């Protein structure tokens, strides 16, 4: 079978890591995938499409014919961090890590990739998402190599700085950067976080109804992790007549349901929305940027 990477992966790697690094990894990827499969004695069924934004995911069969998913990511995406987080969670709220191939691939339990929380009505999806993410917030393993929220957001803040002078994004960028400074000055917690938690990152499973996938793990406070979930289905929010009030209610309801400070969640939601918006501007995705900036302006 062909192992051509989905276009979403091609675009995302180029945007995140640069076209040169992406091309150098994607070029030999089909042959590399065959090598990983052969070394692990796995039979490929199909490539998951549209798939993820940082890895190639194949649905496979193990030597005993049991189903699994094989995830192959470039070294610069630090797949060992995902491995360490999944191993620490050991299936609690997240997909279970079954094995690691000699070539660095992650062999994961097979979930239902076609069924995510985005398939549920909004209220039900948010309820299930909150119940899932709370399981992931545990003490990190001793001697871990995960970066902190302060470290990750410092890099992001540096990339946002030029947008202070932008005639349309300048005020929101300044507000987001100020919110970050205040939040990291008084860190609230130091727990293991998913890092990119949203409805699309929670898939249906057999062992449990819903399990998280695709972590970009780091250590810090829960409000940072929840902030990305607040803006889920942003295109629907922006298109609704009561979008602004709905967004603010969502912040309050999620904060209250998970016993966290509303203002810290609001601050991280603002920062993460504006950070994503400025990144979209840099990549030339103006429509995405406008949606994110309008959402951020409501907070």
For the regions a language model picked out, list residue spans one by one.
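A cross-family kinase active-site recognition segment
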Residues: 2-11, 115-171, 217-221
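Active-site acidic catalytic loop and adjacent metal/ATP-binding pocket
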Residues: 49-61, 69-70, 97, 178-224
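ATP/Mg2+ or Mg2+-diphosphate-binding catalytic cores
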Residues: 275-299
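Active-site Asp-x-Gly
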Residues: 205-252, 256-262, 286-295
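Juxta-kinase regulatory segment immediately upstream of eukaryotic protein kinase catalytic domains
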Residues: 1-46
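An alpha-helical support segment within catalytic cores of ATP-dependent transferases
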Residues: 25-33, 37, 141-195, 205-207, ...
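A conserved alpha-helical element in kinase catalytic cores
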Residues: 30, 55, 64-107, 115-136
């Amino acid at each position: 079978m062909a192992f051509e990477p989905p276009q979403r992966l091609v675009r995302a790697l180029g945007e995140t890591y640069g076209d040169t690094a992406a091309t150098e990894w994607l070029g030999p990827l089909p042959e590399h995938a065959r090598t990983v499969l052969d070394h692990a004695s796995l039979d490929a069924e199909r490539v998951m499409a549209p798939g993820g934004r940082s890895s190639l995911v194949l649905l496979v069969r193990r030597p005993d014919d049991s189903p699994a998913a094989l995830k192959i990511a470039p070294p610069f995406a630090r797949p060992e961090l995902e491995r360490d987080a999944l191993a620490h969670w050991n299936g609690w709220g997240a997909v279970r890590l079954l094995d690691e191939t000699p070539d660095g691939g992650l062999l994961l339990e097979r979930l239902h990739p076609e069924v995510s929380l985005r398939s549920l009505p909004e209220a039900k999806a948010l309820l299930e998402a909150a119940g899932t993410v709370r399981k992931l917030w545990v003490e990190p393993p001793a001697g871990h190599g995960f970066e902190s929220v302060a470290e990750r957001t410092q890099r992001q803040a540096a990339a946002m700085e030029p947008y202070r002078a932008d005639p349309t994004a300048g005020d929101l960028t300044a507000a987001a950067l100020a919110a970050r400074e205040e939040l990291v000055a008084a860190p609230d917690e130091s727990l293991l976080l998913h890092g990119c938690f949203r409805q699309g990152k929670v898939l249906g499973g057999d062992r449990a109804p819903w399990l998280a996938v695709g972590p970009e793990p780091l250590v810090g406070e829960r409000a940072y992790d929840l902030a990305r979930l607040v803006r889920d289905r942003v295109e629907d929010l922006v298109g609704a007549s009561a979008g602004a009030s709905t967004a603010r209610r969502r912040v309050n309801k999620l904060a209250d349901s998970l016993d966290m400070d509303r203002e810290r969640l609001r601050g991280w939601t603002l920062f993460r929305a504006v950070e994503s918006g400025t990144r979209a501007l840099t990549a030339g995705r103006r429509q995405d940027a406008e949606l994110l900036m309008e959402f951020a302006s409501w907070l």
